Amino acid sequence: MGHLLSKEPRNRPSQKRPRCCSWCRRRRPLLRLPRRALAKASPQPAAPRSRDCFFRGPCMLCFIVHSPGAPASAGLEEEPPLSPPPPPPRDGAYAAVSSQHLARRYAALAAEDCAAAARRFLLSSAAAAAAAASSPASCCKELGLAAAAAWEQQGRSLFLAGVGPVRFLGPLAAVQLFRAPPAPPPQAEPATALEMVCKRKGAGVPACTPCKQPRCGCGGCGGGGGGGGGPAGGGASPPRPPDAGCCQAPEQPPPPLCPAPASPASECAPIVAAAGDTVRAGGTAPSSAQQQPESGDADCQEPPENPCDCHREPPPEIPDINQLPPSILLKIFSNLSLNERCLSASLVCKYWRDLCLDFQFWKQLDLSSRQQVTDELLEKIASRSQNIIEINISDCRSLSDSGVCVLAFKCPGLLRYTAYRCKQLSDTSIIAVASHCPLLQKVHVGNQDKLTDEGLKQLGSRCRELKDIHFGQCYKISDEGMIVIAKSCLKLQRIYMQENKLVTDQSVKAFAEHCPELQYVGFMGCSVTSKGVIHLTKLRNLSSLDLRHITELDNETVMEIVKRCKNLSSLNLCLNWIINDRCVEVIAKEGQNLKELYLVSCKITDYALIAIGRYSVTIETVDVGWCKEITDQGATLIAQSSKSLRYLGLMRCDKVNELTVEQLVQQYPHITFSTVLQDCKRTLERAYQMGWTPNMSAATS
């Protein structure tokens, strides 16, 4: 078929500008169109090299405009300027309109030019020999019929139907390629369409969906037949003036078309056609040929596999949590429990597993209620992370003193040690902790039956930084060990004793005299009397006092403590039958910072509630459960008069009617009233909110 339609070898290096025929190369200095600033075309993705583009090779208009035959006649230059295209015809009228227009255009060419061009490039050797014997006119006629049939089938497979007609200055092949598949031409005018037949292999271009940006039919306009970029189809460059050879914009914009794929042929064809028209007329061609080689590097590229992909923005990247800095991820993981980190987060990926093994997560270990925690496991944990500062092994029944000793030996920086209800542990464990962890600040070892005063002595003498101790229900502890701790640990702030029958007033006195920083004191159920409790008036920083179930506690001692300890915010006097209305009235008047008052099972009446509501402006929580003398009057008056009350406990106050409580709940929604029925309602409401539904089948059975 000649070098025009032959494939370009795959191993040949890419050309920097479109290849043209010899006539163009010899006369390129004459083809100079005015230089115009072009907007930088958007880069288009390169298509796979395995696909053969129709537009590769020399420009297809060269053999028409610059045919080596006889000189072109002047009829082509005398064609009137292009006018805005008429409204797009429907269905089969596309082919008729295009055929008539191009028939008039190519009729101006010399018949010899058409014949020579067809014989040289498009016809096979046999067809050329047969056509040589015929007249030039009949040859052009046969050539047009064959081209119309071939390009109609090619255009039908390339583009969607319903796209409006586009006027081009190039050959009819370019027009058919960027137009909807035309209907078969009318039978009346089959011979007027002078089209060329392309038999090049791989001439197909992948179909694309119509784009939203309209294109001009002229190759010189932005977004025109040239498509991708460069002088012919930049899309972003300003429109050319009419004298430059571009089409005029119609009054109504044409239907949107797909942008043509960028290629050397599609970009250089309109410019060469315009230049050819000027040369044929005998005038001086504008200097556009100088700009063509310059833009060939960037514009003459293979089209993408899908030509419309160049107009689509790449999908936004999905944010990934792993893009956050490790410090932020560690802060997030710090809000997870040990189970959530070890059994959930660490199994997501290796990166999260490494983060979950960060040393800061192993500073504070909560191993409570885990029966699988043994001495061997505790030793491995301590060996892996020797910077543990807090550990909780409450209810770990599989541990022994040896495991705690290894932990204390490998974690000398331990600050907080908690071991509730570990009845298997003895003084050995507490002595090991005291010996190897001198910075210890918190020791909670409640309900350890084997703990004695010997362990407390070692703890007090070695750990001078103790601030918080809890020895509740350690029944073998006595004043001997407690006094050693009180005299040695002068920084104590919290102490809690519960049911330690061997602890008496001497221990209370020792703590009051040697530990002035005490803020929380609890001696629930201990053998303490008013003689020892009165020493607590020396504690100016006392904020919470728990004196539950002190059988020999009198009202005067309580009133004196409230008067002296101005920072007292919580007072628990439950299970003290001697506390009466007069004591409660003094507490309400003198407790300037008191917020919580617990009077369960005390000998009080409605007058105590009325006094609280009348005299106190700070008390928020009042619990008078199991007080048999409390009635509807007291509950109603305290709710009406107190401005600070937020909780009122009336559990098992049998003289308080439930209907009265229901009315109070409606009238004072800011107050929580605690009764058996009200607590049940709140519990059910929380269960429903968490998704619980009653099992009606089990209830009926």
Swiss-Prot record:
GO-annotated biological processes: nervous system development; neural crest cell differentiation; proteasome-mediated ubiquitin-dependent protein catabolic process; protein polyubiquitination; protein quality control for misfolded or incompletely synthesized proteins; protein ubiquitination; regulation of smoothened signaling pathway; SCF-dependent proteasomal ubiquitin-dependent protein catabolic process
> Which InterPro entries does UniProt cross-reference here?
F-box-like_dom_sf, F-box_dom, F-box_LRR-repeat, Leu-rich_rpt, Leu-rich_rpt_Cys-con_subtyp, LRR_dom_sf
Q: Report the GO terms under cellular component.
A: cytoplasm; nucleoplasm; nucleus; SCF ubiquitin ligase complex
Q: Does the keyword Disulfide bond apply?
A: no
Q: Where is the composition biased (Gly residues)?
A: 227-236
User: What range(s) does the F-box domain occupy?
Assistant: 318-365
Subcellular localization: Cytoplasm; Nucleus
Q: Name one Pfam family in it.
A: F-box-like
Q: Where is the composition biased (Pro residues)?
A: 81-90
Residues that span the membrane, as ranges:
none
In which domain of life is the source organism classified? Eukaryota
Keyword Protein transport applies: no
Location, primary (coarse class):
cytoplasm
Region span, Disordered? 73-93, 227-250, 279-321
Composition skew (Polar residues), residue ranges:
285-294
Alphabetically list the UniProt keywords. Answer: Cytoplasm, Nucleus, Ubl conjugation pathway
The annotated subunit structure for this chain is:
Part of the SCF (SKP1-CUL1-F-box) E3 ubiquitin-protein ligase complex SCF(FBXL17) composed of CUL1, SKP1, RBX1 and FBXL17. Interacts with BTB domain-containing proteins such as KLHL12, BCL6 and BACH1; specifically recognizes and binds a conserved degron of non-consecutive residues present at the interface of BTB dimers of aberrant composition. Interacts with SUFU. Interacts with PRMT1.
- Free-text function comment from the UniProt entry: Substrate-recognition component of the SCF(FBXL17) E3 ubiquitin ligase complex, a key component of a quality control pathway required to ensure functional dimerization of BTB domain-containing proteins (dimerization quality control, DQC). FBXL17 specifically recognizes and binds a conserved degron of non-consecutive residues present at the interface of BTB dimers of aberrant composition: aberrant BTB dimer are then ubiquitinated by the SCF(FBXL17) complex and degraded by the proteasome.
What the record says about family reads: Belongs to the FBXL17 family.
PANTHER family given for it? F-BOX AND LEUCINE-RICH REPEAT PROTEIN 17, MITOCHONDRIAL ATP SYNTHASE COUPLING FACTOR B
Tell me what this protein is called: F-box/LRR-repeat protein 17
Look up and give the organism this protein is from: Mus musculus
Q: What is the lineage of its organism?
A: Eukaryota, Metazoa, Chordata, Craniata, Vertebrata
Task: State the encoding gene.
Answer: Fbxl17
